[in-house]
Amino acid sequence: MTNNVSIVDFLEGVEPNINKLYIQDIWDLSDEEIENTHDFIQWLFPTDTPSRYNLAAPVLSEQDILNIQNSKKAKKNLKYSANWFLNFLDRHSYWIDKHDHNQLRIKRIKKCLRLLIDKNLSEKFLNRVNEFKERKK
């Protein structure tokens, strides 16, 4: 929990994050907003490691992890968020040849999916990213 906002409730879509955005609001961001907004990714894809770049980002406790793993809605929304971000990556190629925040986002998403859902989904996500890289070269 960060600033009295439940990460589980946020992922289930019933509570906004500390910026007053619901998960649906983030999914509705334009590509320009996705590229230029840097504090949403930690909410869509929380991990048990503090962010070096967003001190207000949620850090999952063991109880948060269990609650998310036991929430069908949170897991469904995590999967949707992963596909949403894959679609963003597929629409662009500038992220492929440079090490930038999108590469860090990809690492975070992979870690989040592994931690909260399963290793296979994490690997499928990374495989899709690699397919985009190959196709866009």
Identify the residue ranges that each predicted region occupies.
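N-terminal leader regions that mediate targeting or early regulatory function
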Residues: 1-93, 102, 110-113, 119-120, ...
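Post-transcriptional modification and biogenesis factors for structured RNAs
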Residues: 125
